[in-house]
Amino acid sequence: MTNSRNKGAQFERDIAKKLYQLLGVNFARDLDQYRAADHGDLIPDDPDFPFVIECKRYAAGTGCMPGWWAQVWRAAERTKLLPCVIYKYDRRDIRCVIPLGAVFECSHDYTIEMDLETFAYICREIMADD
């Protein structure tokens, strides 16, 4: 468990760094995620950032697991932000999943998956509208 927790923590730090490079927004790891339920993994320093982010790093798998989506959705309801899962499997690219409703008006049951750069583009567009 320690290795998997370290792997997850390193992935969170990597995503925070990449998002800073793409958006100019600083992110800190939310250490309350280990003490209380329904927290995202990264906290932005920009109050206009529209997403609560859950980061997942695993050796193998395909796509965003339903449990991950349910977890970030609970955090999104608590924080009144849009949910986002950023995940990576070994030897695969980083993927981001957000509700399709973040881009088009529709039910939260539909999601859209994209790379990190596209996610950053959508974040910039949403933040510019505010």
Predicted regions and their residues:
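Catalytic phosphate/metal-binding cores of nucleic-acid and nucleotide-processing enzymes, i.e., regions
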Residues: M1-D130
